[in-house]
């Protein structure tokens, strides 16, 4: 039986990476066999692409950015995700295709159709079964990142992150059957409890 595929999404600073780690710990205690990955990265090739994408010294044009993310994603799908799912493992990914929709398609202005075409090739049409979207305001994200060294995308201005959030909220509205919206403005453990509740409800329903 094919394993379940869960992705986490949100603007930079929303706390999704922390929530991925907490969910991983919880599900392992519950006995689930799972593989946790990140984007861009997760493979040797992907991690090299990640270095290029996040380096603030690099001037990267929107189309280049889209293709670099897609190349990392293609490697991750072929090398890690599809083999794990075929073995029945649960796969949790910190960012996936929706990041490209909102960052390159919406915030960079490339358009969703262009991003969709490229990424359908990269992922072989693979989509997460559910996507946990951690929602916070750009103001809160900026506050949380104060004092921390920002990468190339984190260092974008307020308007960019505002567009990213708008893009995510549009996806949540357009694909309610896949997206789970979590209020990320609360403290870490409160958010974790909401994530666990939502994921466990999905997993129980998927077993029926």
From Swiss-Prot:
Pfam families: Thymidylate_kin. It is an enzyme of class 2 (transferase). GO terms for molecular function: ATP binding; dTMP kinase activity. One of its GO terms (cellular component) is cytosol. Gene3D superfamilies: P-loop containing nucleotide triphosphate hydrolases. Keywords: ATP-binding, Kinase, Nucleotide biosynthesis, Nucleotide-binding, Transferase. It catalyses: dTMP + ATP = dTDP + ADP. The keyword Lyase does not apply. InterPro entries: P-loop_NTPase, Thymidylate_kin-like_dom, Thymidylate_kin_CS, Thymidylate_kinase. Phosphorylation of dTMP to form dTDP in both de novo and salvage pathways of dTTP synthesis. Belongs to the thymidylate kinase family. HAMAP family: Thymidylate_kinase. This is Thymidylate kinase. It comes from Caldanaerobacter subterraneus subsp. tengcongensis (strain DSM 15242 / JCM 11007 / NBRC 100824 / MB4).
């Amino acid at each position: 039986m094919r394993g379940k595929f869960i992705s986490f999404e949100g603007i930079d600073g929303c706390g999704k990476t922390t929530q991925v780690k907490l969910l991983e710990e919880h599900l392992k205690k519950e006995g689930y066999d799972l593989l946790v990955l990140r984007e861009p990265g997760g493979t040797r090739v992907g991690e090299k692409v990640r270095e290029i994408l996040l380096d603030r010294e690099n001037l990267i044009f929107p189309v280049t950015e889209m293709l670099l993310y897609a190349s990392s994603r293609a490697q991750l799908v072929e090398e890690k995700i599809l083999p794990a799912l075929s073995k029945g493992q649960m796969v949790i990914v910190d960012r996936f295709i929706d990041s490209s929709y909102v960052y390159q398609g919406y915030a960079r202005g490339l358009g969703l159709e262009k991003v969709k075409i490229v990424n359908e090739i990269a992922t072989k049409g693979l989509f997460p079964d559910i996507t946990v979207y951690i929602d916070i305001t750009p103001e809160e994200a900026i506050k949380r990142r104060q004092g921390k060294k920002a990468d190339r995308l984190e260092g974008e201005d307020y308007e960019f992150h505002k567009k990213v959030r708008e893009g995510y909220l549009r996806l949540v509205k357009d694909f309610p059957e896949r997206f789970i919206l979590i209020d990320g403005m609360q403290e870490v453990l409160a958010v974790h409890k909401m994530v666990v509740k939502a994921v466990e409800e999905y997993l129980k329903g998927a077993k029926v």
